Regions:
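Active-site acidic/histidine clusters and adjacent loop/turn architecture
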Residues: 39-104
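A generic structural signal for short, non-catalytic loop/turn and secondary-structure boundary residues
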Residues: 2, 39-44, 105-107, 125-127, ...
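Active-site-adjacent structural elements in enzyme catalytic domains
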Residues: 25, 29, 33, 67-82, ...
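Mid-length scaffold segments of soluble, non-membrane domains
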Residues: 87-88, 102-136
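Catalytic cores and adjacent binding grooves of peptidoglycan-active enzymes
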Residues: 117, 123, 129-206
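Hydrophobic h-region of N-terminal signal peptides that target proteins for export
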Residues: 1-8
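Hydrophobic, Leu/Ile/Phe/Ala-enriched alpha-helical segments that form helix-helix packing faces
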Residues: 3, 76-80, 84, 180, ...
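N-terminal module-boundary/linker segments of secreted carbohydrate-active enzymes
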Residues: 10-57
């Protein structure tokens, strides 16, 4: 689905950054922006970016994130686009009714979503728009419970084996990893007690 940009949006070569307009707010309210959302609408920004998929096709993507990381994300995705780095899909998680599992299973890259960390009652950094998940199906969230490995999303179990070669895989030698680290993000693949290979986040610093 194609969405028209509001008048006055800052654009350059298919990339734009803007405040949350009324039309965008209508798309997210009650979904990623839930009624009890503690993140202010004014703290969020809407981004449109260009990206390639693994077939080399040019795609238009969109994200919502916290204002403090918006310029960083815009710069990162411009560099990824120039390098033809493959990202399969990038639409608002609201297209999946803010269902994180469904979005991940579709290998959809997304950022803001007011939700809890999978398997817990703690708010995720996605709730403030300070985290982003890149190509999540191929870079799953892996944790252990009572000695049993748990992999999210469902269907991503084979991609939890990081010794294998497959498309969209993020490693420390990967351009995506290097760019996010360059801009001060931390990677979930470096966590000790669990691994979230899709996940990059940044602390809120004004």
């Amino acid at each position: 689905m194609l969405y028209l940009l509001p008048v006055g949006a800052q654009q350059a070569d298919g990339f734009c950054l803007m405040e949350i307009s009324d039309s965008i707010y209508m798309r997210i309210y009650g979904k990623s922006f839930k009624e009890d959302c503690t993140t202010s609408r004014t703290d969020l920004r809407y981004l449109q970016v260009m990206h390639y998929n693994k077939e080399g096709e040019v795609c238009r993507g969109e994200l919502i994130c916290h204002r403090t990381i918006a310029n960083d994300l815009l710069a990162i995705f411009k560099e990824l686009y120039e390098a033809r780095y493959p990202i399969e899909r990038m639409v608002l998680v609201d297209e999946y009714n803010a269902d994180d599992e469904a979005s991940m299973a579709a290998n959809n890259t997304s950022a803001f979503n007011f939700r809890y960390i999978s398997g817990t009652r703690r708010l995720s950094n996605h709730s403030r728009g300070l985290a982003i998940d890149i190509n999540p199906l191929y870079n799953p969230y892996v944790r252990w419970r009572n000695g049993k490995r748990m992999v999210s999303p469902e269907g991503a179990e084979k991609y939890a084996d990081r010794s294998l070669d497959f498309p969209y895989k993020i490693t420390r030698n990967d351009l995506c990893y290097k760019l996010f680290k360059k801009y001060g993000f931390t990677w979930g693949g470096d966590w000790k007690n669990s691994k979230d290979y899709q996940h990059f986040e940044k602390k809120w610093v004004e």
